[in-house]
Amino acid sequence: MKWTNKQYVDLMTYNHPERPMFSELFGPIIGLSDEWRSQGATEDMIAMKAFAFDYVPYYNLGNLDTIHRPKEIVLEDTATRYVGIDHFGRRVRMDKRTSTIPLPETFPVETMDDWLKIKHMFEYDPCRISEDEIAKAKALQDQGVLIKSEILGGFDILRELMGEENCCIAFYEDPELIVDILKTISETNVKVLSQISKKLTIDQLSVHEDMAGKTGPMIGPNLVSEFIVPYYLQAWELVKDAGTKLFCQDSDGNMNPVIDAFIEGGINVFYPCEPAGNMDIVALRKKYGHKIAFRGGIDKHVIRRTKEEIKQELLYKMQPCMMEGGIVFGLDHRIPNGTSLENYIYYIRTAREILGLPPFEECEPSWGRMAF
């Protein structure tokens, strides 16, 4: 079912929603489509449309990413392998059989001088937003499309520029570099979001971090509060004052130790809430109540197991305390390889039954990616 921006915002702010959403946030991982075709899947199933998922269409307003990027250089590109130099000047490599994101082998920033060479890519430029783009977004918003703007992650961009190890060390040994990077990006955020907020209220501010593994985040709550929270608040307080209600963070892994710090920074929606990283949406709901909302939270690994295990996962995650709003139920990541089509269909049917939704076969085909 296609939702409107108002329905989605009402759901995520606990404003008397009709029901929770049931979605597929990401879709199948590489290779699963071929597995399912061999098991009799239709092309509508491969495209996720057959399962009548809930979704809200969205539009990203304003360019808060890097600009004036140098041309990427391809060093090797075969059927199974890609090697190149990306827009940051990093040497990157990707195995096309298992991945869609090239991984960096080198990083451009070790010192302040390194940063100054690429700083212009993060600074404000009028090309980042235009009156025509704002007008287009306003027209879409009036039609029910969710309008979002996305700032760079306060940790994520540092990791992209410096690598995880050097980034974490720099918080202690070169805080001036960290501060200058975040200050530069923040100034750009404020200028662009100020222009937007004079003409319309965005529905959601988004940020991507991916800053944690199974055992915890790569920096703790003290560093988040000292460096990341002020960066967040400069953007969030601006759009919040203009009427924006949602500030959504995307981060894998175990974020439990830093949730309170990020709430301090304005975050009120977390996803994908990875159970393998000890992110339990039921426990989090009981701890935080209506203070935060979630997308995801259903263990993607369970759907490769027995049907009874699938049912128990759904009964636990979809218990009555989770039905008050503030939740988009869905797998915590892409559907993993080895998930049988039979199991996936059982998962869909069981979830829809628990939620009181009609069988997907009786509904209009629908799906929209919900990773925003």
Please place each PLM-identified region on the residue numbering.
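N-acyltransferase acceptor-side catalytic subdomain
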Residues: 5, 22, 46-48, 57, ...
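Segments that shape or occlude catalytic/ligand-binding pockets
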Residues: 32-70
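Acidic surface patches and DE-rich sequence motifs
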Residues: 77, 86
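Active-site loop segments of alpha/beta catalytic cores
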Residues: 1-39, 83-85, 94-95, 112-372
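A structural signal for short, hydrophobic beta-strand segments that form beta-sheets
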Residues: 70-76, 97-99
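Extended Gly/Ser/Thr-rich low-complexity repeat segments
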Residues: 93-106
